[in-house]
């Protein structure tokens, strides 16, 4: 067999494969054996029908075509390996020459991974927010903790902002009660504004047993946007009493003996949280910088598949929450065209980011050891609410394990870039990121062999940060022509 490669574009190549007839004989013989078992001919036992009889019954051309189709996947695979083609899509195969006794010539066009030229890692510079925790932020957290230990005490007075009330609610539009708009004994914090617009103004000043009515605009349902008359009856008023901020409160609400120790712990936790956020910001800005500096073409088939996958996930999400696409777009304040353009841009960035990180993995020979893989498997199992062994079995049934390995490798590549990049805050002061410690790569792990070609979907819709890795691997050739 002879294979040659022609580059059609940075992301697509054309293989031309020439196969002597002698190399097709094993496939031809296998086809005869298979047909001999399938075809029933009087006077011959199953599996014993001679090739010449099969030629007479089925036609030599039909048998040759089937033998070629049987041989194509293996021939294509050998050509890919011989020419070292990193395929990303199903090939488009065309048989350009074939005759009985003559050579087989076919072409296969396929999308490939583009070449990525990486910049010097030390040249990368990003700016992140400085880690700052103010006294006001500490007191805000302390106030939230204090609020959790508040006591609700019944009072006999008019409703005030901050009170907790028990309400009976009903609503009607044009004199007709609205289905599902009734509630009794509903607990509500006055002034929170998280129930019905206009409710706070209506019930402030009311007393236990008093009924107030007001008009508001319906936000959902068939009558969304229409006015509705709401009736609210107060069935009880409770005042929130906060505990005193002292050492006794610190002892009750935490493991600390003094209020100063509790404040110090809150500050430490806030700083840790800000440092974690700082790392996340650095990751995003580093990827943005790489996307600006590195030109990475995206194969059309890969982009189309990623967009389709995102649209499918979005449809499932909308169905789950009980809404439709027009309503969702209205919530976003986007037209169909604007949303589609944003999805397309986001999908393209996701694919380009993965190509860049994969290039870093190859360039730096980043590997993954069993401990790292198990750590991530356990973490994700916990997030999914299943046992690690069950989660591992679920991954093993599909491409999940390969996807997990690719995700871990890319995360390690990103952290390696952050370790080498120049990171400063808004004032230009160098920032030392709180990066996780990197374990030494497993010298036996070969990243190029440990992963398939995968693409991370950043979100169901633009802005969603939960990425899903979906493998894209070579598949058997489909012919669109014959000899």
Swiss-Prot record:
One of its GO terms (cellular component) is cytoplasm. Residues 473-483 have a biased composition (Acidic residues). PROSITE patterns: FKBP_PPIASE. The keyword Isomerase applies. It is found in: Cytoplasm. It comes from the Bacteria. InterPro entries: PPIase_dom_sf, PPIase_FKBP_dom, Trig_fac, Trigger_fac_C, Trigger_fac_C_sf, Trigger_fac_ribosome-bd_bac, Trigger_fac_ribosome-bd_sf, Trigger_fact/SurA_dom_sf. One of its GO terms (molecular function) is ribosome binding. Residues 459-483 are annotated as: Disordered. Its EC number is 5.2.1.8. Residues 162-243 form the PPIase FKBP-type domain. Keywords: Cell cycle, Cell division, Chaperone, Cytoplasm, Isomerase, Rotamase. It catalyses: [protein]-peptidylproline (omega=180) = [protein]-peptidylproline (omega=0). Its main location: cytoplasm. One of its GO terms (biological process) is 'de novo' cotranslational protein folding. PANTHER family: TRIGGER FACTOR CHAPERONE AND PEPTIDYL-PROLYL CIS/TRANS ISOMERASE, TRIGGER FACTOR-LIKE PROTEIN TIG, CHLOROPLASTIC. Consists of 3 domains; the N-terminus binds the ribosome, the middle domain has PPIase activity, while the C-terminus has intrinsic chaperone activity on its own. Belongs to the FKBP-type PPIase family. Tig subfamily. Involved in protein export. Acts as a chaperone by maintaining the newly synthesized protein in an open conformation. Functions as a peptidyl-prolyl cis-trans isomerase. This is Trigger factor. The gene is tig.
